[in-house]
Amino acid sequence: MPVLLGTPRKGRMSEYAARLVWSEVEKRQGVETELVDVATLPIPVDDAGEGAKDPELAETMNRADALVIVAPEYNHGYPGLLKHVLDTNLPEYIHKAAGIVGVSAGVFGGARMIQNLVPVLRELGLVTIFWDVNFTSVHSRLDEDGALLDETFLPRIEKFLDELLWMAATLRYGRENVPLGGSA
């Protein structure tokens, strides 16, 4: 289950949030994970077709049953590079679970970004869970080194991961056992 850090900006607090979520995923038994940073992907910005696909990311998504996206809210939306990266791996997303972690300096914690990203993920074939994590006022949740300042925040991440892993297992069962257009 890759954790996709969805912004390339310098000084990004989203990186700390992504690392925290990733570390919590690593604690889960039987779950393979890796942190994928859009800033380091070799994806050309002038091509959104098959030629823009990063083979390593495609292979990661082929193996994955779920995807965690961690992204900040920029002007009520999501980062453009995140959208570009998502657009390059269309077949690999079909019938896989997705969970979104929003990050913002304000009180909404990326909620408006999440609202805008959900229909995009649905169009790509991902199935989003209903539970999100919102890092509201991120500077009061994480210090300048990325350490969590409020341990009571961890149960939110745990509930999010519980829901995401349940959905991932359910969708994996469906992909493996229920023919498309068929019945169980």
How should these model regions be labeled?
Residues M1-P91, L148-W166, L171-A184:
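N-terminal beta1-alpha1-beta2 submodule of the flavodoxin-like/Rossmannoid cofactor-binding fold
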Residues E34-V45, P91, L124-E144:
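Mobile beta-alpha loop/short-helix "lid" or hinge segments that flank ligand
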Residues A71-H76, V101-A111, V138-E144, Y173-N177:
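Repeat-unit-sized solenoid/scaffold elements
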Residues A98-H139, L149-R156:
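Short, glycine-/small-residue-rich phosphate/pyrophosphate-handling segment
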Residues I94-H95:
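His-Asp phosphorelay/catalytic-motif detector in bacterial-type signaling
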